């Protein structure tokens, strides 16, 4: 009997120890298994409160990448400077766009790139305006008025006047403002287009051909005219004429055009581009010396050549351009140019300027 009692007591003691261990383990399990809050329990009569876990910091917001606009520029004071200043002064960043600038030397290839969807906005000279009139690009801003297109003849060619171009070979990038001046000169000299052997060349080819004496004359524009003068010497050149010879009947606006599809699908990006362009345009006019230096660095065109180009340009402040848009002046400029394109066969008829001139984005940006 006493043995049974002793056995029972021993058994009871073992059970008490086991229960005590289970309670301790249970308390520990509760402490370690709670997430995001304070967990407490007792083990051996002691408080085992666990500090609350620190709340997770919100994930840092990744900066959104700015939308990109593919812009065709030309390496001169007109076609490059707004892009240069827009980047240098942060105007494009302020407007909320990124620019992918693509270099071109004349307008027609730019329109081809727009048709292929590779270019959204482009700078063009007056000579490519007929492509806008054909519906291939909407004019959204007038960069400036150009007086820098010229027709040069070599002294050894014997050409002294427009009429002397008969039977001569002229290098000209067709579809450009240089060709427009050539055509006006041919008409002024009492000749017909077929009287002159006008050879289509790219800009570099036309300059090289003239310098090498492979053509009798060249129809080109600043700053390439300056390069010709440096290589050949002014004494070996006969200047037949430039834009000013045909003022005020004809004015030669240089333009910024937009791919019609891009304008339709992303008008807000066109407005953002113009918001930056307007600032760059007005800064260029007021700070021409700094502008020349920055543009020369970007384009690798000598400063002297850009200075010559400045002298053959009539600038238009952005607010003044608003007036020209509203009073119909801009429309008249382009419709008048169309008459030349009809004469030389680039267009079959003069179409209304408001079918390809789109001032709405500009007027929305400049109040």
Describe the residue ranges of each PLM region.
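Pocket-lining segment of extracytoplasmic ligand-binding domains
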Residues: 126-128, 198-199, 204-208, 212-297
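C-terminal motif of bacterial Sec signal peptides marking the signal peptidase cleavage site
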Residues: 24-27
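Periplasmic-binding protein-like
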Residues: 144-153, 236-260, 314-316, 354, ...
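Bacterial N-terminal signal peptides that target proteins for export
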Residues: 3-16
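Bacterial signal peptide processing site
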Residues: 29-32
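Conserved C-terminal helix/tail region of periplasmic/extracytoplasmic solute-binding proteins
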Residues: 334-367
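Short, glycine-/small- and polar/acidic-enriched structural segments
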Residues: 36-37, 41-202, 216-222, 239
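Secondary-structure end/capping motifs
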Residues: 264-346
């Amino acid at each position: 009997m006493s043995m049974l009692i002793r056995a029972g007591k021993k058994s009871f003691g073992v059970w008490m120890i086991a229960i005590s261990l289970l309670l301790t383990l249970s308390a520990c399990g509760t402490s370690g298994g709670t997430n995001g809050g304070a967990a407490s329990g007792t083990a051996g009569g002691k408080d085992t409160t666990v500090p609350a876990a620190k709340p997770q910091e919100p994930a840092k917001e990744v900066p959104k990448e700015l939308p990109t606009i593919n812009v065709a520029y030309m390496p001169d004071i007109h076609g490059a400077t707004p892009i240069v200043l827009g980047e240098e002064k942060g105007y494009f960043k302020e407007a909320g766009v990124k620019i992918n600038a693509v270099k071109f030397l004349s307008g027609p290839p730019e329109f081809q790139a727009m048709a292929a969807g590779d270019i959204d906005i482009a700078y063009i000279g007056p000579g490519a305006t007929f492509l806008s009139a054909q519906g291939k690009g909407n004019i959204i801003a007038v960069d400036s008025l150009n007086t820098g297109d010229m027709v040069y003849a070599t002294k050894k060619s014997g050409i002294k006047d427009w009429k002397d171009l008969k039977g001569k070979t002229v290098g000209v990038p067709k579809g450009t403002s240089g060709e427009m001046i050539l055509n006006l000169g041919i008409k002024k000299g009492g000749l017909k287009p077929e009287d002159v052997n006008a050879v289509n060349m790219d800009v570099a080819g036309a300059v090289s051909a003239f310098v090498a004496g492979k053509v009798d004359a060249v129809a080109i524009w600043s700053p390439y005219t300056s390069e010709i003068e440096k290589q050949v010497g002014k004494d070996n050149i006969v200047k037949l004429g430039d834009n000013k010879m045909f003022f005020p009947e004809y004015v030669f606006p240089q333009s910024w055009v937009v791919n019609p599809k891009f304008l339709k699908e992303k008008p807000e990006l066109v407005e953002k581009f113009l918001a930056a362009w307007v600032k760059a345009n007005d800064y260029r006019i007021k700070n021409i010396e700094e502008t020349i230096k920055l543009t020369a660095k970007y384009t690798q065109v000598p400063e002297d050549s850009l200075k010559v180009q400045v002298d053959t340009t009539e600038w238009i402040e952005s607010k003044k351009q608003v007036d020209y848009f509203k009073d119909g002046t801009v429309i008249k400029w382009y419709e008048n140019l169309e008459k030349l394109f009809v004469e030389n066969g680039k267009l079959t008829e003069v179409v209304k300027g408001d079918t390809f001139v789109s001032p709405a984005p500009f007027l929305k940006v400049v109040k």
